[in-house]
């Protein structure tokens, strides 16, 4: 169905493949997508705050004609998906990996379609518990429910067991098969295989860390593996940026050599070193020579001092907080 609102075929393709909901036998038109967005916002504002959108017709026409755009994440999820969880309305987020709960929270947020910036810096990873020295197979079975919360809960329960030195079984029989339509969120199910792969990966990673804390690189790898299970219609759908210590050589070379063969999950994140002050010339050259040698263009730069200066100029938050960033990192640009 040709849509006359878009100047190019590419724009029309992006709408149909990313934002148009399935209506039983066809996808939404652009006009129907925009109407769904405004219906949801109008109804929500009236129900919760007794507020009606002024000049709705004028605003709707501005979006239809591509003069302005609302939150594209909300444009995609407006309706039952966004009504169930407002996480689905956010484009991006940030979390330091300083607690075991960070892993299942990242899984849940990514499944809601929200990008995740995370820090695997030593100052955060050092807060994680020590992994048990010994592991034993148990009869405990984690029953994973067929929902975003169910997947996240399953990972949380597995990690809790592993910290206690127990290797449980898991039951994924309740998950819908690959290709089944996701009526609320849209797209099609990946089936249980990606989650099963993640749970096995997690067990092996913890066994290799027996008797010590997870290293920053292991935290990074686990988050990247988590992102790899976010599959919609056979397409990977997750956005990550990983922040790491400037002096971490293991993170510096994480995408060097044939990493794409041995550690393909690392391709799910862009990697950036955190600069908290001007580095000495030796450190600077070492980092940039590594970037050149990697042929991957990484690691990039996240200037934490610049982020703090930006916050100070806005006078709305504590500028001494150790800020991270969202995957695009445009939030600190002037």
Regions found by a protein language model. Give the residues of each.
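Extended catalytic cores of very large enzyme megasubunits
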Residues: 1-334
């Amino acid at each position: 169905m040709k849509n006359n609102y878009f100047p190019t075929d590419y724009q029309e393709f992006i709408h149909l493949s990313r934002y148009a909901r399935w209506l039983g036998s066809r996808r939404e038109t652009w006009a129907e997508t925009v109407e769904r967005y405004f219906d949801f916002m109008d109804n929500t504002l009236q129900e919760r705050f007794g507020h009606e959108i002024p000049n709705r017709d004028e605003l709707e026409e501005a979006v239809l004609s591509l003069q302005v755009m609302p939150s594209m994440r909300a444009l995609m999820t407006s309706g039952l998906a966004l009504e169930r969880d407002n996480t689905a309305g956010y484009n991006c987020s940030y979390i330091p990996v300083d607690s075991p709960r960070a892993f299942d929270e990242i899984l849940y947020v990514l499944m809601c379609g929200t990008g995740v910036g995370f820090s695997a810096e030593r100052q955060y990873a050092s807060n994680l518990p020590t992994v048990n020295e010994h592991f034993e197979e148990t009869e405990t079975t984690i029953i994973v429910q067929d929902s975003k919360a169910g997947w996240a809960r399953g990972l949380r329960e597995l990690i809790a067991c592993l910290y206690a030195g127990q290797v449980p079984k898991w039951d994924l029989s309740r998950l819908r098969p690959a290709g089944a339509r996701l009526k609320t969120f849209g797209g099609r199910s990946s089936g249980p295989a990606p989650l099963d792969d993640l749970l096995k990966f997690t067990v092996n990673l913890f066994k290799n860390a027996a008797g010590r804390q997870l290293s920053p690189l292991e935290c990074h790898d686990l988050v990247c593996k988590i992102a790899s299970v976010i599959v919609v219609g056979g397409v990977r759908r997750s956005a990550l940026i990983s922040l790491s210590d400037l002096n971490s050589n293991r993170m510096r070379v994480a995408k060097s050599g044939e990493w794409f063969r041995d550690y393909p999950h690392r391709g799910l994140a862009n990697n950036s070193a955190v600069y908290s002050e001007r580095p000495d010339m030796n450190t600077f050259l070492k980092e940039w020579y590594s970037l050149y040698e990697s042929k991957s263009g990484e690691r990039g730069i996240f200037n934490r001092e610049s982020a703090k200066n930006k916050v100070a100029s806005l006078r709305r938050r504590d500028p001494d907080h150790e800020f991270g960033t969202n995957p695009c990192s445009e939030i600190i640009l002037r």
